[in-house]
Regions:
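Gram-negative bacterial Sec-dependent N-terminal signal peptides
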Residues: 1-23
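Alpha-helical, coiled-coil/dimerization segments enriched in small aliphatic residues
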Residues: 215-242
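Short helix-initiation/N-cap motifs at beta->coil->alpha
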Residues: 32-34, 96-108, 239-248
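Proline-aspartate-enriched helix->loop->beta-strand connector
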Residues: 101-104, 108-125, 142, 248-264
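Bacterial Sec-exported substrate-binding components of ABC uptake systems
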Residues: 21-58, 172-204, 313
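Structured C-terminal subdomain patch of bacterial secreted/periplasmic proteins
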Residues: 100, 152-168, 179, 190, ...
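A short, structured surface patch at a secondary-structure boundary
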Residues: 49, 54-111, 119, 124-125, ...
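Extracytoplasmic ligand-binding site segments that recognize negatively charged/polar headgroups
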Residues: 75-81, 126-132, 147-160, 196-225
């Protein structure tokens, strides 16, 4: 059984920034859902919904100077060690107002409005989930810019990166980061094409529930898109649009050649069998938990298990611009 651990601290606090004009001017942008949005830049009071590390890495060490609020739980609750490290290195994070979290239903339009922002930045999944709740934001004349790193496509990563560059006044840096990302993706795809091997059937599962219960898999987003990008045949693509459960019998019937179980730090003390990966996770602990998934009913006969191609990956390394780093 082989084991892969992906974890990296984006050196946002080490990045320098150039001068930004003090006078705001209207700039029209096209966001990742194709909306034409006019924003007065530089924005002075920004509320961020997600993609904080990317915003900081692109915008530099003063990127948060004009940020007044964010959805704290998406970072602090989903990746506590990452939050602890960043909030210590960047004290401004502790001063930002918390507007709640979309996925658990605590996101507060009232809290957003109370901050009197001149820009709201959301992930596409947040924008879609909030739906008509955003009417009040629109009526207040607050522009909303939608980003999408979750799609995990080169096009959306590049577009989102360049949008952040425009919003933070760091277009040149954003262009370089976007070009670097595309170069890495193109190199991977060129190598896959040159190898000219049969596409392995791939199954990826978020291992937060442990071996006893199947959790979500990924279709055309996150790990599903990554599997496709690197030349795999994602067995969930025809059953799951973005992410969601799949019938365990379908996994057995598909006979995947490769299985990837993703994990994070949060489950370390919550569930003794759940997959854990990331900051401060002992390798032996992660390997022990990964081995538990190989013992699922029927899995012993799968090609992935027979051929020792069961892997673990850090769940938080899907979505960010840094997903191309080793």
């Amino acid at each position: 059984m082989r084991f892969t651990q992906l974890s990296a601290l984006i050196a946002a606090v080490a990045l320098s920034v150039g001068s930004v004009s003090a006078f705001a001017k209207p700039v029209q942008l096209t966001d990742t859902v194709g909306r034409k949005v006019t924003v007065d830049l530089p924005a002075k009071r920004v509320v961020l919904g997600f993609y904080y590390q990317d915003y900081m890495a692109i915008g530099g060490k003063t990127a948060l100077d004009n940020v007044v609020g964010f959805s704290k739980a998406v970072w602090a609750d989903w990746a506590p060690p990452s939050w602890a490290a960043f909030s210590k290195a960047v004290p401004k994070l502790n001063q930002l107002a918390d507007v709640g979290e979309v996925e658990v239903g605590t996101f507060s339009i009232e809290k957003v409005l109370a901050l009197k922002p001149d820009l709201l930045v959301l992930a596409e999944w947040q924008y879609k989930a909030l739906g008509s709740d955003l009417d009040r934001i629109n009526k207040a004349g607050i522009p909303i810019v939608v980003l999408d790193y979750n799609a995990q496509t080169v096009a959306k990563h590049v577009q989102s990166t360049k949008l952040i560059g425009t919003l933070t006044g760091q277009q040149q840096k954003a262009d370089k980061l976007a070009a670097d990302y595309k170069r890495v993706a193109d190199t991977i795809q060129a190598r896959v094409q040159k190898a000219n091997l049969p596409k392995p059937k791939v199954y990826v599962e978020f291992g937060n529930k442990g071996p006893a219960e199947h959790s979500v898999t990924f279709g055309k987003s996150m790990w599903g898109s990554m599997a496709t990008l690197v030349g795999g045949n994602n067995i969930a693509a025809s059953s799951v649009e973005f992410y969601g459960p799949i019938n365990p019998e379908k996994v057995l019937a598909a006979k995947p050649d490769v299985i990837v179980i993703t994990g994070r730090e949060t489950e370390l003390k919550k569930n003794p069998a759940a997959m854990v990966m990331g900051w401060g996770i002992p390798k032996a602990e992660a390997e022990k938990r990964l081995a538990g998934f190989a013992k699922r009913a029927g899995w012993a006969n799968l090609p992935a298990i027979k051929n020792n191609r069961l892997y673990a990956a850090y769940h938080a390394h899907s979505r960010p611009l840094s997903d191309s780093t080793p």
